[in-house]
Curated annotation (Swiss-Prot):
Additional record remark: Reaction proceeds by a ping-pong mechanism involving intermediate methylation of a conserved cysteine residue.
Domain of life: Bacteria
Reaction equations catalysed: adenosine(2503) in 23S rRNA + 2 reduced [2Fe-2S]-[ferredoxin] + 2 S-adenosyl-L-methionine = 2-methyladenosine(2503) in 23S rRNA + 5'-deoxyadenosine + L-methionine + 2 oxidized [2Fe-2S]-[ferredoxin] + S-adenosyl-L-homocysteine; adenosine(37) in tRNA + 2 reduced [2Fe-2S]-[ferredoxin] + 2 S-adenosyl-L-methionine = 2-methyladenosine(37) in tRNA + 5'-deoxyadenosine + L-methionine + 2 oxidized [2Fe-2S]-[ferredoxin] + S-adenosyl-L-homocysteine
Record organism: Cronobacter sakazakii (strain ATCC BAA-894)
Upper lineage: Bacteria, Pseudomonadati, Pseudomonadota, Gammaproteobacteria, Enterobacterales
The protein's name in its UniProt record: Dual-specificity RNA methyltransferase RlmN
Length: 388
């Protein structure tokens, strides 16, 4: 059965979905077992249903043939499996696919990036973003709300269903998930962590913890909490070799400076097995802003005590941005300086930029309700880790 993609016209015409049924996509395995316990069922029934949901992308209880008819009927009365719908699809000349996914009356964006040996899905965690990184299109849209567990894992579910339906086209199944889409994942831990647990669960998508990566700009208290909650690979959105530059392009640095951030990163490395002893440093290359050889020397000195590999990211432009992309020659010189210090340094290949699906280009459709409030809190009061 081919996967239906809802048109924007369909989405705008459809009434808002209001249901008192439990959306099983909101439940990790522990919560799923608790739910089945309330139905008077044994825990293995939860495992059976999860296997149908995630191994087969099944959202119809009647298709779950190893579940007895009485239980299927009971589930239809009190529960549902409802993933967010794709309302627009764009395909890049390089094979990258970007989906606009409806979450309520707004959209987030999810990107599928196939390569020879893997297929990576870039997943959003919030509707918009409050951190206001100056080089990122998402940040310019403002912030509306956190995504629910079902809206996060639902992006993976929906993509897996589409790619599965497209097997005849030779598309690779999803092998890696990166929490690098719209939003700051650490500002939505309550929903991001259960979603990642489902990604890792053998009855969920069964991914290795080394193949699920969370990227953060540096919400230090939440990073410390993350290390006590789950073990996944970590990517650090650093982007500057000193506080002066980072204060300007990554404003959260005014609250949690580089020294404080990297200390938290080292604490996480000490707790984590997924990172194999080192994290990934993400560094966007902005022409004559942070890409000089002097900046490379500063960065190498800064990171000497942090086990890491470094990804240099050619900046991807968006309308109204005040920056330019570093030239290949400047990126090459920068990379060679870092390698001379012994750092593994990779220049990230730009994918999907012809459909605005590249790093920093995701925008979605955001009603900005809380951006100014979050800005004030970043400048003064501590940022709380909030749920939906």
């Amino acid at each position: 059965m081919s996967e239906h993609i809802v048109t924007p016209e369909d989405a705008s015409a459809a009434p808002a979905i209001k249901s008192e049924k439990i959306n099983l996509l909101d439940l990790n395995r522990q919560a799923m077992r608790e739910f089945f316990k309330t139905l008077g069922e044994k825990p293995f029934r939860a495992d059976q249903v999860m296997k149908w949901m995630y191994h087969y992308c099944c959202d119809d209880f009647d298709e779950m043939t190893d579940i007895n008819k009485v239980l299927r009927g009971k589930l239809k009365e009190v529960a549902e499996i409802r993933a967010p719908e794709v309302v627009e699809e764009q395909r890049s000349s390089d094979g990258t696919i970007k989906w606009a996914i409806a979450v309520g009356d707004q959209r987030v964006e999810t990107v599928y990036i196939p390569e020879d040996d893997r297929a990576t899905l870039c997943v959003s965690s919030q509707v918009g973003c409050a951190l206001e990184c100056k080089f990122c299109s998402t940040a310019q849209q403002g912030f509306n709300r956190n995504l629910r567990v079902s809206e996060i894992i639902g992006q993976v579910w929906r993509a897996a269903k589409i790619i599965g339906a497209a097997k005849v086209t030779g598309q690779r199944p999803i092998t890696n998930v990166v929490m690098m889409g719209m939003g700051e994942p650490l500002l939505n831990l309550t929903n991001v962590v259960p979603a990642m647990e489902i990604m890792l669960d053998d009855f969920g998508f069964g991914l290795s913890k080394r193949r699920v990566t969370l990227s953060t700009s540096g919400v230090v208290p939440a990073l410390d909490k993350l290390g006590d909650m789950i073990d996944v690979a970590l990517a650090i959105s650093l982007h500057a070799p000193n506080d002066e530059i980072r204060d300007e392009i990554v404003p959260i640095n005014k609250k949690y400076n580089i020294e404080t951030f990297l200390a938290a990163v080292r604490r996480y490395i000490g707790k984590s097995n997924a990172n194999q002893g080192r994290v990934t440093i993400e560094y966007v290359m902005l022409d004559h802003v942070n890409d000089g050889t002097e900046h490379a020397h500063q960065l190498a000195e800064l990171l000497k005590d942090t086990p890491c590999k470094i990804n240099l990211i050619p900046w991807n432009p968006f309308p109204g941005a005040p920056y330019g992309r570093s030239s290949n020659s400047r990126i090459d010189r920068f990379s060679k300086v870092l390698m001379s210090y012994g750092f593994t340094t990779i220049v990230r290949k730009t994918r999907g930029d012809d459909i605005d699906a590249a790093c920093g280009q995701l925008a979605g459709d955001v009603i900005d309700r809380t951006k100014r409030t979050m800005r004030k809190r970043m400048q003064g009061e501590p940022i709380a880790v909030k749920a939906v």
